[in-house]
Amino acid sequence: MALLAGLVAPATTAAARAAQGALTPTVEEQRLDKAAPQEILRRSGFDSVAPDFARDLTRTHSFEQARGIVVRDGTALWRHAVHRAQGRGPAGGDLSRDDDRPLYWARLGMTRDVRTWEPDFGIGDAQRSALLDQLERTSRGRSDIRYPSRATGIKRILVTGFDPFTLDQDIRISNPSGAVALALDGKVIQTDSGPARIEAVTFPVRWQDFANGTVERTLAPYLPKVDLYTTVSQGRTGRFDVERTNGAWRGGYPDNDNISSTGTIPVAAPATPPQWTTTTLPYKAIVTAHTGRFPAYDHTEVTEIPTGSTEPVVRPDGPTPGSTAREGGGGNYLSNEIAYRATLLRDRLGLHDTLPGGHVHTPVLQFGAGNTDPATGKITDPQFVRNRLAIIAQLRSILTTAANTALK
């Protein structure tokens, strides 16, 4: 997600999407019928998730019954994906357990079912929207965050990941940050200050969800209660980056619904939001520790419009005073935006000096040699799996290093 600035493709406007009507599947949902998503679902055992959910929906006789089914099945989907990723229960097929894609495509099948469902008892736009919101919340782990009591002495770490994206370029794409979330959710790691429990959630790659406040609604109840947090996304080839600075600018690259958004990141009052926010992760310790096979960098470069100027300038060492953001360290797509929103929320909650938190970019998850052509390639290969497992293991090591340094 890091390096998408300036690569603005033709995009659907929000108004055009709204004009399609409530019962029309989204662009994102329409990809579900392609061969690769269907193979991913079939080879993981997730191909029955949406059909079973649709059957349960048709048996309801009221909105409240439907809401109960959505909460139940959304929660079950998240837990099933976590259990599969962590080696519990049946694999459901020969697709490697660490794969994040079955969850993504199964969820889209469920959201499409809700969006196109026309029950005999009738359902209004607000009710349908409420069901979709509940499905997003439960199937992304947001209603499943469980930390032990402080009396146990166990530290608390929160991690976020993302859905796959740029799927029109390669429908097979996986997102290692989503795989990290599934692999680490509920795990306890050993740190120098004792055990720490990780809880994880995932976010969509959609501008409107962010504008609607999904990041703040998800994180606000927990940032005051955790000891460390890290937002995670896929970034550059062959390297991890701890993003030092985040910028308040959307660069316009289309999201998973092919919708574009350009301008200052829209955040709620109070006060005028700053152009820049900064990490409070112990970046020096992270980049000097041996955490895995990929190098890790303290990434300080941003793009700004300096005070008194109108043209953007790349600053290798971070922003100058009074400048206007055009790219944070993580670019100006949704990875930069979640980093900006989370760190701004941290600061608005008065936690800047007490809560270590910021954004980590993973390496790009690459397919193996001979399997790079989206038109002819397979949905997985041994090198692809090894790369994803290496990224997951190194992110866990990075979290351990951060906790060892910051939670003494």
Predicted segments — roles?
Residues M1-A18:
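Secretory targeting and sorting signals
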Residues G330-A342:
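Substrate-gating cap/lid alpha-helix
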Residues A19-A325, A342-T343, D347-R348, T354, ...:
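N-terminal catalytic or cofactor-binding beta/alpha core of small enzyme domains
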